[in-house]
Structure formats: structure tokens, C-alpha cells
Amino acid sequence: VYKRQHMYSYIFPQIYQSENATRDTHPALFGITKILKVEAMHRVTDYYGPIIYKNFADAGKHYRPDTQKEVYYEFFNELDSAVVALTSYVEANPESNGFSRFDILLDGRYSSWIKFANSLRMRLAMRISAVEPDKACVEFQEGLNNEYGVFEAETERVAVSTKSGYTNPLGELNLVWNETYMSASMESILTGYDLSLIHI
């Protein structure tokens, strides 16, 4: 429940504001926002099933939740929008690297974000392959055949860079707040198997 509350209290409102602020004036940032939105929210629907997605901030529709099928279809639509926006921007501004100073996930190139979108599309297609194989096949091929490609090498990954001094917030929770504990399940496993790790 905490994950869902956190998402709707802090993350989704920022995404919503970013979409509205960039839609007509900053197409590349709009595309990146869409990708991050899908990346963040697909985990939420996989945990909870139906979620408020298309009707977020729409009081007129009473914030009606979408079915998981509707959410996944919207994910693919939003990745379409992201790829179109980024591709158009890259083709019109091939030397642009204005985002590189702020990109702490990838290498600062807009083309890498298109790769991310394509790879994410393939991942989501695999998630629905057992229940909607035809849709999954279409979406998988869409990502695979995009001219900008997909992540193939181990070095091509989305990870938070610590070069600018950014540190993992779990370090703050553990070292400063002193609120990170072993779970009861983990303790039972270590104790049950009489593993020496329990004494470290």
C-alpha cells in the first residue's frame, strides 16, 4: 500500500505537471517524461492490478481506475508518443545535447532514451505474452525493429549515476535514520539452515 500511496502523492503529480509543462514547448523532455511515467507505473499495476492512470487528476470522471489491460494498452500508446516526439526532435536537432547535464540515468543522448523506450516496450510485451500473444508480438516487433535499436550490451542499462555526488537514499535510511532491519523471513531462513551469516 505504501508504494501506491507514495506514487500518487509524490511521483505521479510531478509526472502530470511535467507532461503539461513540456507537451507543446519541449518535445524531447515530453518524450522522456512519458518514458519515465511508463517505467514507474508498470510496477504499480503489476503489484495492484487496476490503477488510476488515464483519469489521474480528472475529477469529472471521478478518478476512475483503469483495468490492467487498459493500463497496458495506454503504456504502449504513451511509448508511441515518446518515440515519435524524441525521434522528431533528434532528426531536427542531431547535435543537441542540452539534456546531458541533467541526465543521471543514461548517457545524455536522446537516442539512448529512444532505445530505452524500445527496450521497455519489449519488456511490457513479454509481460502480456501469456494472455494476449498477438498484441504482445506486435508490440515486441515494434520495439525490436525501431531504427534506433534496443539495449543489447550489459553496459547499456538504466542506472542512477553517482558521479555528481548523488547517493542511494537507502544509505540515508540505513546509516542516518538507523531504520533498516532484517525481515523475519530472512532471519528464519538463516536460523533454520544454521548459516554462519547470522552471526556477522
Model regions and ranges:
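Structured, solvent-exposed acidic/aromatic patches
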Residues: K3-I198
